[in-house]
């Protein structure tokens, strides 16, 4: 069996990636989230596949087909709740994974980090298109508002929006293409996750100290497979509790009303995992400026390897950077709260201050803190 595992053309790839993979002996539970993201992706693909068997991407029947899935399809209600709440768990794991990489300096593996940013962007696009599919009020108006942002692009903006819509408004053609992309993009994510892992295994995992761990490594199996399995059990428990006890806690009540182009909801907002970016978008009074700020709030992550000034990789022994990291975390939670509030005083000014702080911490305060810490340890 050992010979087959190590020399069979297919099994040896699995063996090198998940069994005999040399892993630092001191990595903590924060390193579990990569495997949890893989589990979330598989869950979303499987539940989505079963939902796609009964869903009809047509403006006249999309909403009723969702109702049909929940009422008439065997276990359709639980499949739908697992899929919609699974997206929330997915983003919770994703943001935690990114936060851990920032804290421990893993972004210095630039290829792994850049493929991770690409994965984040594709995940966000997939989730946005999925939110449109039930064709409720918030689905329709969310699609209208977010796609309309592209009209801010000079010269080609209006044509680009009509091209995305497939007409002069969000309609059947839009829903059809969103369904097609929502179905195919997760498979693209699987391929990109493979590339992500390939780059990671080229360099090996980082560790909490941020030091090279070549002299102290252990095999991935059984030590970390058991650890990951425990994390997976907790994830499944959390997802089932959410889907069975309070399935609508993270959703919007407006989405239980069929889409009505003649009736605008009082407060159009995306799902909770996009609220921080939505708050940054709204904090800029100019439309083009807001769109640029929205995209930069994600793309700014790509600058992190270039902005690293500290001689230490990890923040574990850098108290000043730790304070800034947790300030950034609180700032993102504040932006998430602001995004869920109406556009009025005092939420406008709080959103603007939080947005300025977000960009300031990443672009200025963290690099300056790194230089100060370098000076202090001389």
Curated annotation (Swiss-Prot):
GO terms for molecular function: metal ion binding; ubiquinol-cytochrome-c reductase activity. It is found in: Mitochondrion inner membrane. Its main location: mitochondrion. Heme b b566 binds at residues 97, 196. Keywords: Electron transport, Heme, Iron, Membrane, Metal-binding, Mitochondrion, Mitochondrion inner membrane, Respiratory chain, Transmembrane, Transmembrane helix, Transport, Ubiquinone. The cytochrome bc1 complex contains 11 subunits: 3 respiratory subunits (MT-CYB, CYC1 and UQCRFS1), 2 core proteins (UQCRC1 and UQCRC2) and 6 low-molecular weight proteins (UQCRH/QCR6, UQCRB/QCR7, UQCRQ/QCR8, UQCR10/QCR9, UQCR11/QCR10 and a cleavage product of UQCRFS1). This cytochrome bc1 complex then forms a dimer. Its cofactor is heme b. A ubiquinone binds at residue 201. GO terms for biological process: mitochondrial electron transport, ubiquinol to cytochrome c. Binds 2 heme b groups non-covalently. It comes from Elephas maximus (Indian elephant). The gene is MT-CYB. Component of the ubiquinol-cytochrome c reductase complex (complex III or cytochrome b-c1 complex) that is part of the mitochondrial respiratory chain. The b-c1 complex mediates electron transfer from ubiquinol to cytochrome c. Contributes to the generation of a proton gradient across the mitochondrial membrane that is then used for ATP synthesis. GO terms for cellular component: mitochondrial inner membrane; respiratory chain complex III. The keyword Heme applies. Belongs to the cytochrome b family. This is Cytochrome b. Heme b b562 binds at residues 83, 182.
């Amino acid at each position: 069996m050992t010979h087959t595992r190590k020399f069979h053309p297919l099994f040896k790839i699995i063996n090198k990636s998940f069994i005999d993979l040399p892993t630092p002996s001191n990595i903590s539970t924060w390193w579990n989230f990569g495997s949890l993201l893989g589990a979330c992706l598989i869950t979303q693909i499987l539940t989505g596949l079963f939902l796609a068997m009964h869903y009809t991407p047509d403006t006249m029947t999309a909403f009723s087909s969702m109702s049909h899935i929940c009422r008439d399809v065997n276990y359709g209600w639980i499949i739908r709740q697992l899929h919609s709440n699974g997206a929330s768990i997915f983003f919770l794991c994703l943001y935690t994974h990114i936060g851990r990489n920032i804290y421990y300096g893993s972004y210095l593996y630039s290829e792994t980090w850049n493929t991770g940013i690409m994965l984040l962007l594709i995940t966000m696009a997939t989730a946005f298109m999925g939110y449109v599919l039930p064709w409720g009020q918030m689905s329709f108006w969310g699609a209208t508002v977010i796609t309309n942002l592209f009209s801010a692009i000079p010269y080609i903006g209006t044509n680009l929006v009509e091209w995305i819509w497939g007409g002069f408004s969000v309609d059947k053609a839009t829903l059809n293409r969103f369904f097609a992309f929502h179905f195919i993009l997760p498979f693209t994510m699987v391929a990109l996750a493979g590339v992500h892992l390939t780059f990671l295994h080229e360099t090996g995992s980082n560790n909490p100290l941020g030091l090279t761990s070549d002299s102290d490594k252990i095999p991935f199996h059984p030590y970390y497979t058991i650890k990951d399995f425990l994390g997976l059990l907790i994830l499944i428990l959390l997802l089932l509790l959410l889907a069975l006890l309070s399935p609508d806690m993270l959703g919007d009540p407006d989405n239980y009303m069929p889409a009505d182009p003649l009736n605008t909801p009082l407060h159009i907002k995306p799902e909770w995992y996009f609220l921080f970016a939505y708050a940054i978008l709204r904090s800029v009074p100019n439309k083009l400026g807001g769109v640029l700020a929205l995209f930069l709030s994600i793309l700014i992550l790509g600058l992190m390897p270039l902005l690293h000034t500290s001689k230490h990789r990890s923040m574990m022994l850098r108290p000043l950077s730790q304070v800034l990291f947790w300030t950034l975390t609180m700032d993102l939670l504040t932006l998430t709260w602001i995004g869920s509030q109406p556009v009025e005083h005092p939420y406008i000014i709080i959103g603007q201050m939080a947005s300025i702080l977000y960009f300031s911490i990443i672009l200025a305060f963290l690099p300056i803190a790194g230089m100060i810490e370098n000076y202090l340890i001389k």
